[in-house]
């Protein structure tokens, strides 16, 4: 059997498969379906300084080869995440978890990360500067190299945990933003978040979601994600987590060949909650099929 383990910012993962934030709750919900300790880790639901009720409904809609969502970072706020959600997770998950953090100001990001820094259960801070469906924050920090670097510096000043900056594809030059984050001290980069999209109901002549626009995800965005992972991973010297349209073991291998150290799986979890477990089970067979003995050896191996 091939070797599946990878090292992500100094922490060893049994395998590179990571359910993406926003598609896996706080983890314990999925523990009712299978043993989530089979995962490399997972990125829990995007957490903000204060509670958020999210956007008006409808906020999720299916479309060809994917879905559009504008949930709007609904979450109980960092205090409740620490007091209520993490203790529930500790009962069913014995690995380090990735905390996904969003904010509406540099101070928001720093405050939330400083709170989570005190939690032993948290192994990495995934700082989301790329949410396309909230107003007054989120993606605005991820579309400008200087703003992304400012958030990175602020977070690095309050934590000793690895900081991974999650980038938006809705930019003209993602490489410059990744390099700015690296220069500001980021320990890793994750990409891509969803593509900004919109669909209109022909009968009502209204957008299919109340927010009008939202994040498009699903198999259709895989080629865009692979391209951006390739570009960024060849421009920085820190680990890259690839995501976007991943739904099977072959997609994981493709992302790693493009340069990803680990791979997040998002929308596919909403189609089939067993997706990540199945990918992990399928990886040894796919590795054998393509003559891969050690996943670490193929990172960035595209010719």
State where each predicted segment sits:
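C-terminal helical cap(s) of enzyme catalytic domains, especially alpha/beta-barrels
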Residues: 55-64, 200-214, 256, 268-293
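A short, charged, Gly/Pro-tolerant segment at domain boundaries
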Residues: 296-303
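Predominant activation on well-ordered alpha-helical scaffold segments within soluble catalytic domains
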Residues: 31, 82, 86, 149-153, ...
